């Protein structure tokens, strides 16, 4: 059986993976290696912490016999391509600074486009204590309308083209009514009415997207305009068609007495006719900040019809902040910031803004702890905040989501009444971030939200829309079943630069999204270049160690690299990724050696050589195969150990050797069981199989290159041991379920068959698999809990590698068809490395 990364390496392109287990705790090291100072000076010109790369590893003289060249070079002029790529990347980063600066500005202080529609309604609010026809309370809004009419006579946001839309028609009509109310801007009114007349057919075209409540608000505003004496530029037939739209909508809503309908009517109250609105009922939805749903338009309409100190105070706060440029929603900082944080993570560039993201999450956590309305009462904000806070180690309880545990709560909200897919998707994603078995609220929330999303996939409401792809992707790939490079590529290729929040009118600027897409595409392209150069380096290493000449082993170098890249994706972690890939390749060689390429005597001979290590010349080579395998192992482990020792400022090579020795001994035990037909107990099986899972030889060495000091007390800590245990257990059990049928045919046992045997055949195979899947889920939650907790001793970047490894294991051991199958996943990983991005602009 293969490790999760071996599963990639095996794939369907080669023979099926054999039984391989996982590792255990590796001890730390002690004294610094003698070559550390020289390497440190070469890379840093002094005594600073070194960045060691494979470019100089050949120079690291370990004091041991030098074996055949490992393909490393000493001078930067002849360094491997991926090291040159790192230097190029440093220059490329200067080009990206403009994008990063603009993204950072929006991240820290979200930009809101002025909303002509909301500005118009705020402009209609009269000065308190005066006759309604005497003076506006917010003259700056009236002035903005006068100064910001487009050349075609319209008002409204239209960043992409000059064509009309229902949103622009609604905004234009609102601005006309505001100017007419204060008897100003006759020329602007004339031009605005001409624009509406020219584009009136759009209003009744049901194929054109409409803002929320358009079929109620636009007809009501047409009636208001006519009552104000405006000569509305439409025929009586056209007016009747508009009113028919309103009547049809009211008929559809007539029998609905739900709280959701009440919330919906309150949300669009500014556009409803007077006879349809009970303002005392509407004001029940007023928030602590005085607003209705954080909507300036709805709040202004309430003030027009019914004076309220808190509502007026809210509008003053909006105008004081934005002047006449009132946005559609305020406040929206937290939602906007969290949305951008989520986007940065999804498209793979969050590491460029880590400190800024932490400040935002710190602020969000404070608001969460205070149960602030801006976070808790807005469903998508609440769900997104919970997910991001929990995944970043903040102590948020699922009990805080009790108000959205039931589907009825969702349906009684504005978002639920509007059947808002984005809000529903956020609730579903939040439900999956479970850290224990006792979180019934998340379980309930995931059940009903998942069912509703599946129903949406079967309907025509969102077919062909970008949100449909998001829903399909989220349902098919939970966050623990995705690989970072694949996830980043999918999100970049499906990025919609025109996307904006589903609200009454357009509000969010697109240029920020364009900057995000540009930076992500540039970052991903550089990753690809780095990956390609790393593969060339690995091919040279394979030839120089003569691994390609071994007849008993399968050719798995590229696949070994793909599995390493799936687990360690950032281009700046080249050394960790290369170390991991080389180690995977060697574990596959050892796997095949013990499985099909050696006798018992050869296996014992190889173990004896590794036990002697530097004194290997005291042991004779039993065969050329033993010699070839040992020399490849000896050369590479020493090389990696020397580099890791330079980075860690102490000798860590011997601990990597010990992990290899543990691995080889467990392979020998497995081989002996096969030869003797021994049936181990479940306890014996798991104890051995978690070592042959190959986590020890492949992961610890990579962890040394993650930019963190892994002192001896860290790698001997119980937390470290538990991370290994949980990851090994998950991977072993996932492997066993996937490989059960094949191993039965080969006469081999694994945890599934042993569980059935232990039950004396009372338990069926399917029941055994179900029980094991429950164990996997439990281990996964516990693993995630350890990874995200902030009070541990293991550095965060190192813990995250365990989580990425779990995701690699989960994906490649999935039994699902299509994209989740190893064959499809291998094709997708190849696409990550070799195929250019297919963005909307391409």
From Swiss-Prot:
Q: Please tell me which stretches of this chain the record labels as motif DDXXD motif.
A: 591-595
Known EC number? 4.2.3.35
Subcellular localization is given as: Plastid, Chloroplast
Kindly state which reaction or reactions the protein catalyses. 9alpha-copalyl diphosphate = 9beta-pimara-7,15-diene + diphosphate
Binding positions (Mg(2+) 2) = 591, 595
PANTHER family attached to this UniProt entry = 9-BETA-PIMARA-7,15-DIENE SYNTHASE, CHLOROPLASTIC, ENT-COPALYL DIPHOSPHATE SYNTHASE, CHLOROPLASTIC
Q: What name has this protein been given in UniProt?
A: 9-beta-pimara-7,15-diene synthase, chloroplastic
What organism does this protein naturally occur in? Oryza sativa subsp. japonica (Rice)
* Name of the encoding gene: KSL4
């Amino acid at each position: 059986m293969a490790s999760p990364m071996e599963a990639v390496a095996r794939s369907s392109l080669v023979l099926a993976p054999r039984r391989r287990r996982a590792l255990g705790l590796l001890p730390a090291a002690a004294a610094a290696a003698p070559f550390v100072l020289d390497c440190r000076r070469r890379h840093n010109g002094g005594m600073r912490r070194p960045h060691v790369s494979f470019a100089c590893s050949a120079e690291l003289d370990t004091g041991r016999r030098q074996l055949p060249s490992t393909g490393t070079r000493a001078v930067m002029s002849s360094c491997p391509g991926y090291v040159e790529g790192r230097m190029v990347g440093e220059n490329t980063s200067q080009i990206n600074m403009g994008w990063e600066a603009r993204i950072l500005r929006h991240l820290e202080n979200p930009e809101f486009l002025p909303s002509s529609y909301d500005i118009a309604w705020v402009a209609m609010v009269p000065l308190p204590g005066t006759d309604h026809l005497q003076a506006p309370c917010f003259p700056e809004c009236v002035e903005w309308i006068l100064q910001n009419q487009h050349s075609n006579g319209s008002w409204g946001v239209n960043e992409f083209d000059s064509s009309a839309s229902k949103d622009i028609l609604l905004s234009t009509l609102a601005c006309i009514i505001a100017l007419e109310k204060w008897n100003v801007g006759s020329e602007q009114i004339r031009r605005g009415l001409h624009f509406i007349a020219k584009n009136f057919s759009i209003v009744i075209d049901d194929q054109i997207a409409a803002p929320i409540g358009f079929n109620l608000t636009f007809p009501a505003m047409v009636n208001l305009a006519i009552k104000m004496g405006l000569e509305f530029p439409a025929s009586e037939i056209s007016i009747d068609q508009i009113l028919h739209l309103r009547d049809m909508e009211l008929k559809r809503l007539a029998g609905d007495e739900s709280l959701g309908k009440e919330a919906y009517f309150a949300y669009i109250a500014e556009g409803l006719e007077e006879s349809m609105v009970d303002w005392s009922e509407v004001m029940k939805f007023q928030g602590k900040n005085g607003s209705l749903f954080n909507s300036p338009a709805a709040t202004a309409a309430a003030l027009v019809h019914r004076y309220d100190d808190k509502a007026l105070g809210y509008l003053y706060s909006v105008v004081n902040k934005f002047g006449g440029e009132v946005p559609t929603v305020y406040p929206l900082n937290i939602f906007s910031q969290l949305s951008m944080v989520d986007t940065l993570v999804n498209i793979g560039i969050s590491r460029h803004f880590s400190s800024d993201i932490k400040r935002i999450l710190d602020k969000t956590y404070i608001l969460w702890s205070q149960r602030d309305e801006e976070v808790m009462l807005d469903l998508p904000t609440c769900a997104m905040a919970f997910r991001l806070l929990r995944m970043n180690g903040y102590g948020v309880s699922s009990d805080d989501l009790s108000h959205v545990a039931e589907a009825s709560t969702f349906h009684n909200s504005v978002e639920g009444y509007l059947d808002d897919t984005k809000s529903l998707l956020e609730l579903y994603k939040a439900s999956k971030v479970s850290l224990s078995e006792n979180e019934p609220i998340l379980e309930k929330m995931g059940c009903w939200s998942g069912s509703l999303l599946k129903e949406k996939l079967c309907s025509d409401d969102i077919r062909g829309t970008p949100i449909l792809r998001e829903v399909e992707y989220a349902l098919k790939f939970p966050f623990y079943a995705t690989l970072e490079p694949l996830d980043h590529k999918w999100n970049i290729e499906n990025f919609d630069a025109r996307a904006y929040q589903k609200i009454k009118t357009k509000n969010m600027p697109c240029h920020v999204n364009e900057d995000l897409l540009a930076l992500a595409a540039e970052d991903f392209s550089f990753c690809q270049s780095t990956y390609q150069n790393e593969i060339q380096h690995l091919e040279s290493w394979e030839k120089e160690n003569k691994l390609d000449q071994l007849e008993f082993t399968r050719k798995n170098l590229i696949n070994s690299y793909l599995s390493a890249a799936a687990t360690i994706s950032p281009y700046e972690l080249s050394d960790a990724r290369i170390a991991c890939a080389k180690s995977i390749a060697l574990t596959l060689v050892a796997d095949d050696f013990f499985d099909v390429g050696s006798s018992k005597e050869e296996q014992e001979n190889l173990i004896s050589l590794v036990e002697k290590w530097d004194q290997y010349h005291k042991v004779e080579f039993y065969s050329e195969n033993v010699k070839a395998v040992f020399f490849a192992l000896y050369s590479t482990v020493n090389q990696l150990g020397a580099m890791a020792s330079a980075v860690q400022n102490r000798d860590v090579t011997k601990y990597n050797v010990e992990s290899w020795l543990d691995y080889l001994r467990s392979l020998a035990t497995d081989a002996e069981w096969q030869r003797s037909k021994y049936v181990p107990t479940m306890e014996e099986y798991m104890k051995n199989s978690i070592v042959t899972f190959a986590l020890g030889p492949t992961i610890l060495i990579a962890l040394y290159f993650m930019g963190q000091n892994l002192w001896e007390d860290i790698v001997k800590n119980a937390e470290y041991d538990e991370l290994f245990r949980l990851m090994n257990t998950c991977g072993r059990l996932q492997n066993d379920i996937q490989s059960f049928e094949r191993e039965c045919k080969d006469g081999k046992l694994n945890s599934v068959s042993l569980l059935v045997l232990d039950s004396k055949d009372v338990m069926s195979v399917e029941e055994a698999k179900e029980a094991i899947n429950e164990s996997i889920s439990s281990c996964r939650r516990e693993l995630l809990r350890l990874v995200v907790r902030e009070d541990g001793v293991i550095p965060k970047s190192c813990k995250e590698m365990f989580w990425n490894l779990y995701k690699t294991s989960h994906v490649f051991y999935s039994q699902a068809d299509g994209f989740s199958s190893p064959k499809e996943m291998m094709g997708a990983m190849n696409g990550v490395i070799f195929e250019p991005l297919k963005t909307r602009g391409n």
